[in-house]
């Protein structure tokens, strides 16, 4: 059993990017496999303290990597709410578990024996993997000399996005905007020292990205806000999740690459009818978009060289971290497990607790 603290002693942004880049080589060559994410939404009796739509979201992702002799399934069990902030719908996770905490675990299995070999808390892993995936997209799609970043969002995922970009590009200046009062300033003050980069808080999203080499969105918005008009020649747009860019970005960008073409499968309890009528909001993780994901190449194809990355300095490129895939958690769970075994970290649990003599 491995905690977030254990994972933090093994994971670096550098080894995370390396492990995931190798995974996308595997995926592009057909040498790894995953299924689309599954989300179950059901009513919750949790006291969330605000009068907004809320639900229990039970999410699973799985994937296998033969090269590592490993497979995993990631499970999150979240109480989520969907408030409106400054006219935009957001999704927030409520710390409803014991001690005001969250529930997210990766179960790592050996494909040699079929046995469960590790249970890993997923918080640290998740922060590293999202930033690393977007950085890999930037490595193949942004200009090599890109040094100025416009960042929209200053929450928990913003710092890892910048740390990952710094691994692949010579970042020297960042402008950050957040609609939450004081958040951008606090983020700039705390993160500038940690990264050794000049970070300035600005008054609007457009001011953040104007003249930037790379525009990064790292928000929990469930309403699109980034228009194609902000895509300047030579810019690379890196979106952390698919509800951030407006539809015209997909049409106007010269190159668009998705993390994956597979969408998650959402199953919503019919008990929400009354709530949906009251709030005028349909419970789901992401609102529907009129886009055919099959029209776009994925990151595995880009990394494996099956599709072209940036060809000219003036091209406007766009990477969308459309949704997570289980294989990314397999790759990093195996990295954490191997590193923790070498260091003697974690808590050993009896193997016989997780096997059975009766054939299932």
Regions found by a protein language model. Give the residues of each.
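Residues in the short beta-alpha loop(s) of Rossmann-like NAD(P)-binding domains
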Residues: 155, 179-180, 243
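Rossmann-like adenosine-cofactor binding region
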Residues: 196-286
């Amino acid at each position: 059993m491995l905690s977030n603290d254990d994972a933090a002693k093994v994971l670096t942004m550098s080894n995370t990017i390396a492990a995931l880049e190798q995974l996308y080589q595997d995926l592009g060559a057909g040498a790894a496999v995953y299924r689309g994410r599954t989300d179950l939404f059901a009513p919750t009796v949790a006291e969330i303290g605000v009068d907004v739509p809320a639900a229990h979201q039970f999410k699973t992702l799985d994937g296998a990597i033969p090269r590592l002799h490993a497979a995993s399934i990631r499970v999150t069990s979240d109480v989520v709410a969907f408030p409106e902030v400054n006219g935009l719908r957001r999704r927030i996770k409520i710390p409803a578990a014991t001690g005001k905490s969250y529930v997210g675990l990766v179960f790592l299995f050996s494909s040699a024996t079929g046995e469960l070999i590790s249970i890993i808390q997923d918080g640290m892993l998740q922060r590293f993997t999202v930033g690393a995936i977007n950085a890999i997209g930037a490595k193949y799609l942004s200009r090599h000399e890109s040094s100025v970043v416009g960042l929209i969002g200053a929450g928990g995922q913003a710092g890892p996005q910048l740390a990952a970009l710094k691994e692949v590009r010579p970042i020297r200046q960042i402008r950050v905007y957040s609609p939450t009062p004081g958040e951008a300033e606090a983020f700039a003050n705390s993160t500038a020292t940690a990264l050794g980069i000049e970070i300035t808080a600005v008054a609007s999203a457009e001011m953040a990205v104007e003249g930037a080499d790379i525009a990064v969105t790292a928000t929990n918005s469930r309403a699109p806000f980034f228009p194609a008009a902000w895509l300047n020649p030579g810019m690379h747009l890196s979106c952390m999740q698919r509800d951030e860019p407006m539809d015209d970005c997909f049409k106007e960008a010269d190159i668009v690459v998705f993390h994956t073409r597979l969408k998650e499968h959402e199953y919503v309890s019919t008990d929400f009818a009354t709530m949906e009528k009251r709030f005028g909001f349909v419970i789901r993780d992401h609102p529907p978009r009129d886009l055919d994901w099959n029209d776009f190449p994925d990151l595995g194809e880009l990394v494996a060289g099956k599709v072209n990355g940036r060809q000219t300095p003036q091209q406007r490129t766009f990477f969308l971290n459309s949704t997570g895939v289980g294989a990314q958690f397999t790759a990093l769970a195996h990295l954490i497990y191997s590193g923790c075994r070498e260091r003697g970290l974690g808590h050993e649990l009896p193997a016989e607790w997780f096997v059975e003599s009766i054939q299932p």
